């Protein structure tokens, strides 16, 4: 278990490529929770990341997520839950919830797992995402007011319509 709390600076930073394969991460950072100057690969693990003044996950290069359970909560716009600048953001597995003022959009041509982006909600409200045929995709209590919600999971079916309630 990695329990990281900062009152200044990043939670975890790499000047090159960063790869996370497994582990439990609880990161509460003033600046970016996870920051990679190079490519960032998340292949597994359970990550709960919150930034009080910047992005929860930030890479200046491509971001690839193949597995894991990720909750990434960034601060207000223009900061976000997940920031891959304008680089490739590839999702092929895992469960990802990105909350914040903004989010990078997954690169559709690179992804093999579906994602959805919703407008935000207020703090301490429970959001419920479900398909038009009432199949639950997610229920989660949002700890802070956010403008953007990104969700990706194997539960999201191609061609289905999803709505968020709170």
Model-derived regions, located:
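A composition-driven surface/loop motif
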Residues: 1-166
């Amino acid at each position: 278990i990695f329990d990281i709390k900062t009152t200044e600076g990043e939670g975890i930073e790499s000047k090159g490529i960063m790869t996370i394969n497994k582990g439990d991460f609880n990161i509460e950072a003033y600046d970016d929770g996870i920051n990679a100057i190079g490519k960032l690969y998340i292949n597994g693990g359970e990550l709960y990341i919150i930034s009080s003044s910047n992005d929860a996950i930030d890479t200046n290069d491509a971001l690839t997520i193949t597995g894991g359970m990720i909750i990434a909560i960034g601060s207000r716009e223009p900061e976000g839950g997940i920031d891959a600048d304008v680089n490739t953001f590839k999702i092929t597995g895992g469960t990802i919830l990105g909350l914040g003022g903004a989010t990078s959009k997954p690169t559709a041509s690179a992804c093999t797992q579906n994602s959805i982006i919703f407008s935000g909600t207020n703090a301490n409200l429970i959001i419920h995402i479900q398909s038009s045929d009432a199949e639950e995709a997610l229920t989660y209590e949002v700890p802070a007011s956010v403008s953007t919600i990104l969700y990706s999971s194997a539960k999201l079916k191609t061609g289905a319509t999803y709505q968020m309630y709170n």
